[in-house]
Amino acid sequence: MIWNEEFETLPREQLEILQLKRLKDLVERSYYRVKPYREKMDEVGIKPEHIKSLADLQNLPFTTKDFLRDNYPFGLFTLPLDQVVRVHASSGTTGKPTVVGYTKRDIETWAEVMARALACGGVHRGDVVHNAYGYGLFTGGLGAHYGAEKLGATVVPISGGQTKRQIMIMQDFGSNVLLATPSYALNIADTMADMGVETSSLSLRVGIFGAEPWSDNMREEVEKKLGLKAIDIYGLSEIIGPGVSMECIEAQHGLHIFEDHFMPEIIDPDTGEVLPMGEEVNLFSLH
């Protein structure tokens, strides 16, 4: 299902014109407003006026986890804090968390790409969406919440935990969409089995699962135990959160990237060479 026909079906030529404009704007803002970015670009001899085509993207330096941590917490913001309406952060399990600031417009963009993602995954206006992603500094809960509301669904903002209560709520509210990590979806299924709750007592049709790796075997197990179609979603807080790309319910053959907002590159990590589609190496994204 397509949410935003204008941009999701944009002809490639028009899409690339839009991408180049946004790339130029992004590089200019980063260079002139953020000293660490300017120093990083100066090191490789890149200035905003050097961006003439999308091919010039490969000349930009990488932004790494260490670079983000070195400028913790707000050193990479392009706007003053009085224009930043929200801050999210990673868990920081391997060091200082990586921090991302959102303007009001960023929040609107996030809602837009998440609405596209949920529609792509089979969520419809009027669905009852049981959102069991965590709310807080983690981006999952609020990102999914915004997208579902924009799509016109009814959101149950339950977050994680209290699994027995969650099962009761899904039964009583007639929830037909489950948003959660795949491991928590299995937790729900196992708790249902322990309680003697039949899958048929739920109205679940589709589950949108992400925020952690999961296998095809895990997908099959979730689908069997919860009686739904399990769909994969991808995102990361350093870019925007969930909503970067999404598996479609029709084909389930890879993930669709919303290319008017995110530009993927396939890069050999050893040589830095940009490779054609189909190569299995590292994926880099620009937002």
Where are these regions (language model features)?
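Short glycine-enriched loops at secondary-structure junctions
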Residues: V84, I107, G134-G136, S183-Y184
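Acidic/glycine-enriched edge-of-secondary-structure segments
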Residues: G95-T109, H145-V155, S175-L179
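Short secondary-structure capping/junction motifs at helix and strand boundaries
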Residues: P97-G101, G122-V128, V156-I158, I231
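Short, conserved acidic/polar surface loops in the N-terminal third of protein domains
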Residues: V99-T103, V123, G140-G143, A189
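Conserved AMP-binding loop of ANL adenylate-forming enzymes
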Residues: A119-V155
